[in-house]
């Protein structure tokens, strides 16, 4: 038998070292399994906490979506902007008022033309004979459509009221309120399941991890001391003191192993308890998703409701734009009719002016005719006097056809146009 130089048998040191090594290897395996289980538990507990935050996010999104649809889409965009302003005030009041005004205007303009007698000839009776009187129907057609538009707006207003009540009472006060209450009941920090996760379970989890770590550390420290003792690298007295420590610690190995065994059993049961709690939470999560899905289905229906309003809005918009174009057309016609009437009276003045000019021309021409006739008679007298004094002495061929010609030196033909009609 060999001994250390301090007198401690090598076989006894080897015995302690081998025993420490065996216990360390077994403890590492046992603790590793338990630590993996604890890691799984922690991961699932963290997952539950994340699920709660995710559900809170979903809840907030749904609440905001419903509130947005109710307050912005329904109340602001549809009720205020479409129903109250665009449809009721702009179209059914403003546009209809303009339609009636310009309908009266074009009717008055056409009547004014009818009442304006045409004096230029007998073919036409009044200025209205020169225009298309069907123009008076341009706006009347749009006015005839007003009752239909009013009915559509009235129907859509009732539809809006029904949707608003549905969103208010069935969705907001019903499904959303129920989802809020369900979340507060099952996912608030006061919920007993999450109190277990954040309180008792988390404390136990940390405690078990700490215990197992301490157990492994204790056995590892003992093994390290055995290895130092086996290496025989310390002074004799230090080795002797270390041997006593190893000897005393060796007596605790079995107890530590028993504690590890007990911890493993407790951790297994702890895992089952946590799994039961997590299963309950997952069931609650599934129920939450079921309730939230119902809300999302209702929101999809809300999108369909909006499409109905969009269709009516398009119909009213087309009607409004059509009315505006027709009103502009009638405005142009009214302006043309005014100018036509004014131009006609100017035409009458022009006729009178031309008549006056024709009279002046006739007077000038009559005066000219009288002077020409007098001058012609004087000319004839002079010709006859010439022939009497000289005709017998001049041969005919000296100015052929001219000497005894008594044709007047002028020819006056004219026409004065003085139209009365």
Swiss-Prot record:
Function statement: Autophagy-specific protein that functions with ATG13, ATG29, and CIS1/ATG31 in response to autophagy-inducing signals as a scaffold to recruit other ATG proteins to organize pre-autophagosomal structure (PAS) formation. Modulates the timing and magnitude of the autophagy response, such as the size of the sequestering vesicles, through interacting with and regulating ATG1 kinase activity. Plays particularly a role in pexophagy and nucleophagy. With ATG13, is required for ATG1 activation by autophosphorylation. Recruits ATG9 to the pre-autophagosomal structure.
Keyword Membrane: yes
Protein name: Autophagy-related protein 17
Miscellaneous comment in the UniProt entry for this protein: Kluyveromyces marxianus proteins are shorter in length and have a more ordered secondary structure than their S.cerevisiae counterparts, which might contribute to the superior thermotolerance and solubility. K.marxianus could be therefore useful as a new model organism for further elucidation of the molecular details of autophagy.
Compartments it resides in: Cytoplasm; Preautophagosomal structure membrane
Alphabetized PANTHER family for the sequence: AUTOPHAGY-RELATED PROTEIN 17 (PTHR28005:SF1)
Organism: Kluyveromyces marxianus (strain DMKU3-1042 / BCC 29191 / NBRC 104275)
BP-aspect Gene Ontology terms: autophagosome assembly; autophagy of mitochondrion; piecemeal microautophagy of the nucleus; protein transport
